[in-house]
């Protein structure tokens, strides 16, 4: 069995690499996908549609272009991991989790205990809540167990 796993959320740490390395170390047959993680490139995704003097419209265009990628990859995924960091509010990650719930797409949340209360509804719809990337890898190992 193989899986396509979309890695959603926080872009300021190497959590995606940790999961990918862990999966590789266990020879798991997983294709990982993700949003564009270069913050400047993501913010500029809509610039090809024309220059905007108002930052709202620049952000609006970029959000729509980014959504093409995000929605497509979430829909193609067998499973989604949604990471919430402690430094920034990841509204986009919460939106991705809600989209997964609406699609009945299984997802795992990954965040510290300090975020349990603010994310209680997001966690309630998730199939699992992990606090470490190692726990995520163990879940992936179990799911792919023969």
Question: What would you call each of these model-derived segments?
Answer:
Residues 1-146:
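Conserved catalytic or regulatory cores that recognize and/or transform ribose-phosphate-containing ligands
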């Amino acid at each position: 069995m193989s899986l396509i796993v979309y890695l959603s959320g926080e872009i300021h740490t190497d959590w995606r690499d940790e999961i990918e390395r862990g999966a590789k170390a266990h020879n798991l047959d997983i294709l990982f996908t993700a949003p564009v993680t270069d913050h400047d490139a993501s913010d500029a995704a809509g610039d090809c549609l024309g220059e905007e003097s108002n930052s709202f419209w620049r952000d609006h265009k970029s959000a729509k272009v980014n959504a093409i990628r995000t929605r497509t990859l979430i829909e193609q995924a067998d499973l989604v991991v949604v990471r919430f960091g402690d430094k920034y509010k990841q509204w986009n990650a919460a939106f991705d989790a809600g989209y997964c719930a609406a699609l009945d797409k299984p997802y795992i949340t990954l965040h510290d205990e300090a975020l349990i209360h603010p994310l209680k509804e997001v966690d309630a719809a998730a199939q699992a809540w992990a606090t470490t990337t190692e726990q995520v890898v163990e879940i992936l190992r179990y799911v792919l167990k023969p």
